[in-house]
């Protein structure tokens, strides 16, 4: 067994020796002596100095122009022939400094262009051009580098001064051009105002004059018409239209004989029917029934023969008896009893209210509910005002009356909602006074969001509809021009043929001389055109009908037919629909909550008034006790009233008796009449004699009727004449009204055109004002800080004379050109190999001697855990001691500056502890596999070192753990990056390695691990 262990040890030792020799040969071959390279670069003069340029500058904008001074600086260096410059990334430059590819790295910072163009700043910030030299360079190389950087910087500063002067001159030229443009725009606006709006307004009163004249003329004709019509009606005699009703006018003369015969025949038939039906009438039954009813009435009347005095006497006796009973009743409550009862009842109620737990609980519950209600109400008001970070839509904008009017409300509504906004501000101030500063609330600033909500135009769009009929003999082409801010959906129908709504030219059928145009579609606003659309808030669609391919002859006086069908939709009202409704809803909700808040605000929590309640209850009981006497008097008054009304009651009874008597008399008369009818039916009826000579009376009636009709005809002729005259006047009135309607339409069209022109002119003037204001604002900034009061701004002067300064990125290493330094790569490699040897020593001891037990087994059940912790501590302490020794040696070799030594030694100690703990764990736990992993990490590091070329870092660097340690030491020694995060990570890895070594699992049988 021991022989086998020594074989393992020998193999591992050989592997380590081979790795060390290979590493030394590789490092010597790759890096060599940097001091020797420095001497060679001096001997090969300046053209052997390689300078890496790292351009991190970001472009900026000045006076509307893009400025990239980083590129200009690189172009300036390209003209330098004495040195070799290369533009690379920062990682490539740092790698080049590390492996000797570059001797100098010049870094153009990110804000280089922005800081260089601070011509308008009062105190410009300094611009620094950063540079760094490679570690271990000779002093002569460093001096030459400083000289190169200084010379290039001086030349570049001269160019910057020229750029500043050019910029100032350009600003003056731009100002001159803008002033000329302002004058041109003002002249154009004045000319357009005169021709486009002022002259049409001067002609506008003439339209009112024409309308007034036509209105007066039409009024005169209407007055004359009504006067004539009234005169005709008044002159007409109503008797003229009255027909003599003594004659049967409905019977026509030419049919009188035939009708007379028909009537005579009908009469004969009626007599025959009478004779045949009279026997079927049973009058005896009716007469007997009425006699029986008459006898019943006699019996009832005999029973009601009591006189009026008897009725009256009976009623009086009953009322007197009732009055005596009521007067005999006395009140059971004396005055003393009432006062004693009042006192006892008051004391009892006071005691009950004071000791009633249910009542106290109810009062406390009311107080708690009121407090909870006030708290909830304040929260609702807070939520109504404040805009939450998420998609909250129940907040209130700080809008003024003008903002509401601009959003589409009338003045009354704007005043109403402005008052609600003021209430919100008032509540906000009260709320902030009660709350700490961190909980203060504010209304959301309003930036025209409500008046510029284009969501409905983007999602729903606007309907585009138009119907037009165009007549022309020479139109053969349609040109469609759509608004570039909108996407159009739909079609254009030309005589039933469909075309899409898009920019296009369509050849029309020339056989038609009439084109029926129908436009039906939807225009949706493009999201990326929202800003441009809000400038005029109008959607345009132009349909231009014209004649294509026509070449006008010089003598051809016939103009080309062009019909422009343009649709212009001003969508100002659509921009505030949804957002305005949402805002008004939020304001209404706040107003309702605020009214409840003001109603409950002034109420104080007063104690419950028990005394008032007790007095009210006692007074109610006492009043009922004292009201007995009043109730008795009221009943006696009612009895007296009944006695007074007894006569009327008796009269009603007697009147009913009289009505019964009258009914009896009527029945007797009816019986007598039926007896007479019975006698009449018993007799035979006489046939009437018809006088045939009565026909002459019909002739007389015909003559009279003819006279009446003649009179009516004369009057109707006169009325027809008057009607014709009225028609003539009505036609004249109609013509005047048509002319008046045309004048009104013309007046309306002119007013609408003037409104459109005024809006166009207003938009142009507003645009000119905006451009002028922008120019004044921008021109005001030009060199506004060139003076500090009455004196020249010395800071700006110093900046413009020497804007860019150099800044040396110092290294942690002492830059001694006569001293050789060790590479961080070799340093990290030696540390890792030392940790591998240490780990193998611990592993070999444990295999030979067994696990280290510092505490006896019979001491405690937790001895194994304590032994493992002590073992991990010993391993970690070994790494700490080795790290301290290696750190002190490396500090002297690297010549670390005094202020950086403590951190450097701490980094070395933590790195060494991580290496020792992790490698020891791998060997103790997974043995041969652990050794393989350790050698694999070392091999990856070798491959990564071979890939450290100027081309950049490869994938191997990203997966090699030792490469990260190498970069950490390199960055620290070159003062490139802070190491705080690196120290934290190393500390965490030390803790992990310590814990892993505490939990080693030992296997009973030998396995691969």
Curated annotation (Swiss-Prot):
It is found in: Cell membrane. It is a multi-pass membrane protein. GO terms for cellular component: plasma membrane. The keyword Membrane applies. The keyword Ribosomal protein does not apply. The chain crosses the membrane at residues 7-27, 822-842, 869-889, 903-923, 928-948, 979-999. It comes from the Bacteria. Keywords: Cell membrane, Membrane, Transmembrane, Transmembrane helix, Virulence. This strain lacks esxB and esxC. Component of the type VII secretion system (Ess). Provides together with EssB and other components such as EssC and EssE a secretion platform across the cytoplasmic membrane in the host. Belongs to the EsaA family. Homodimer. Interacts with EssB. This is Type VII secretion system accessory factor EsaA. It comes from Staphylococcus aureus (strain MRSA252).
